[in-house]
Amino acid sequence: MSGVAGSNLFRLEEATIDELHQAIKDGRTTCLAVVRHYIDRVRAFNGVASALVTQDGAAVPEATGTVRAMAPLRFPSQTVKASDVLPHLDKYKGPPLEFGRMEPTASDPEVQQQFGMVVGIPNAGQVNALATLNIRGERSVTCRGEFDRHPSLGPLPPAAPPVCEYFRHFPDALDRAAELDSTYGRNPDFEAMPMFGVVFSFKDPFDTKDMRSTGGGDARYDIDFPARDHVLVEQLRRKGAIIFAKAVNTEYNGRAGDPGGRHKPAKVLPSTLGYQRSTWGGNPSNPYDTRRSASLGSSSGSALSVSINLVMASLGEETRASCRGPANHNAVALILPHKSMLGFDGGAIGADIYCDRSGIHARTIGDCAKILDALKDPVAGYYDPRDPFTTVPRSSVLSSGYATHAKASGAPGTLEGMRLGIIRESMVYPMGSKTEEPIVTAAEREIKDILGGRLGAALVESSDPRWQRDPDLEQMATDFRGALAKLVPVFMPDLLFRLGRDGLPVFKEFAAAIVPTEFAPGKVFGSGTMQPIDYCVALAEGRTSPPSNLDLATIQQQELANTFRFHIAQYLMRRAADWKAQGFTETLADWPALNARSKFWGDDQRAAFENWEEVSDPRNTLGGRQGVNERIMLRELLRRVDMMVILENKLDALVRLHTPWPPGLIGGAYQYDIVSNLRPESLSGPNAGLTEILIPAGYVTTVYDPVFSLSKDATRYVSAPSHTPTSIPEPGLPFSLVFRAEPGKEDVLLKIASAYESASKRRIPPPVFGPLPMQSSAASS
């Protein structure tokens, strides 16, 4: 994209917000040129990246999907034979498998999408990051084609729904870019509009009044765009941003689980690994290896679209992994503010309102911080009256703003005098396992060499029975296991009485120490002499050894709460009411209508949604574990645990490895049969709702992927470890470090994270998705 000859060429790929603004001021680019450039990249790289897995591997008829970037999607006709993915398929005796197939969508029966089993296509050259582009004629199914005719081109066709007359007056991304150029030229007020010309994608659950918004779901709304923007989208519009696209995501923010009930799937999927997938938008692929998962969380397309330069920045949502996982897998920066400094559930489809929160993806932490500042309303601040979780203490929001703290250099000694606690629990793994070894080895070296060696921070490590202590590092006086022993008896004694899936006590040493006691209705355990309350006193005072598995990983499991039933009903009610206030009718306004007018890529979700529809009580079964209560208690406990570790070790912040596992193969075997490859320890920050900042930390070129094995009874496929290495072309597969501290200490976190980013410079753009031919630089007007 070029404006003037010679050294003044502006390269849009990998550009920062400041570099974009300088190029606009210099006349080296325009907003319209930037949007056109991104559209060209979308057309080149945003196609289908997955292939169907069919029973016989036979080709399927050619099929087309919805229009994106002015051309319809085209699906591959070649399929993968299921027996090439699943060993001993001829001996399988379990429930019927849901093989891959093409079907019309519910939203638009004239277009098709992939359903059932898929795998990533090797060297696809495509990633499928964006589901909807804000381009006139394709940004809505309700008002598609000529029903979105520009007002200057005359009246709409007679068959157009009445709401389309209202809708077509919203400028699309090209219109808005041209409007910004004509109004402000080379001299916009960047203080009043700090996001001027910055092109954003949004995880689909964020409501955008000028684009289809369905949470990624294939649901046939009367009006598939909402009547109002999400409050964060509204703020970005006001600050000059270009609302460009809705990103592919795991629909309904990770599908929300199954509350149980009478509805069962007719067919099952042997794995959903790498299915960060939308029935409407399809499945994304990793830009460093398109056979692999684009994320370990549902905001896949948000980070992916940033990583391959389809947009400059994106807003995602995290329940328990949905922003950090995508940032990790795509080597981009993330700031995930504490729950809930930034609103989410007030104008979005969530999954678990007690954990859902908004996060910011960009290629640098400095840009993330600039965006965080821009999201603040000059009067209301970050408060959203539609989201009760934004009632956070005012002292937890920095009065100085955030971008000013994200400017640390990577010079030697920048972090001298600061103390960082290493969460070794994030790096431990079973003895003899190979799958974690490459990333853990690299991350251990990165922390020690860069954070400690170059930047000068004092490193203090926690302990774990599976971790061999580093003799060069200080050991925590009180670590996470010690803090849990002191705090569980006070803040969440219920944990000690928890039963596992086998119906037996999770904490066996506790059961062995106490007298026979009812752990749950009709479930009595205990073979010792202590009263449970006296055991709690002894545990808190250090008079008895804690259970060997009382650790960060074991305590994260929670009962599924019934709040998804509440939240979706509330969202649909509000959306219909907003349209009624505008004089239009939306009849998809409750659970029965949603289920009657939806399709799902997996039949397990169809059954789950029908079960959700029949949930009638906000409480879980009386006498059993209560999901809402557990979320509130666990948040309090985990925040106190972090603070005890920080205070008793005089730490400034904590650092952890996001995950020791590389991006998994799409449709492949899980690690240790852990669904979605979510390590329990990694859930601590989300369950606590604490601010976390993620920075790319490097790449590995050797991985050990688990493989499928048929269970002994031949009724299901399970994971088996592999010691066979797979070589990945340079630069390899990414991994990231995560920095964490309490609310109100984001200034410290940003200093540490920006210093590390500046010193390490680990991000490498995905090589396959570089500048387009004849577009090595970004054109001005």
Stretch-by-stretch model annotation:
Residues G6-S7, E19-D26, P158-R168, A219-I223, ...:
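Second-shell loop/turn segments in exported
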Residues I39, R43, S50, A63-Q113, ...:
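Acidic-enriched catalytic cores of C-N bond-cleaving enzymes acting on peptides and small amides
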Residues H263, G627, P663-R679, D705-S719:
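Short, surface-exposed loop/helix-turn segments at secondary-structure junctions
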Residues G120-A160, A192-D356, P385-T391, I423-E425, ...:
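Short glycine/serine-rich loop/turn segments
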Residues I17, T30-L32, F190-E191, F196-V198, ...:
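Loop/turn elements at helix/coil->beta-strand transitions in domains of secreted/extracellular proteins
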Residues S2-D222, N249-R255, R386-V397, A406, ...:
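Short, well-ordered alpha-helical
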Residues G3-N8, A124-V127, L133-A159, M195-D218, ...:
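Short helix-loop capping/hinge segments that flank enzyme active sites or metal/cofactor-binding pockets
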Residues K25, V35, A44, S307-K434, ...:
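Structural helix-boundary/capping segments
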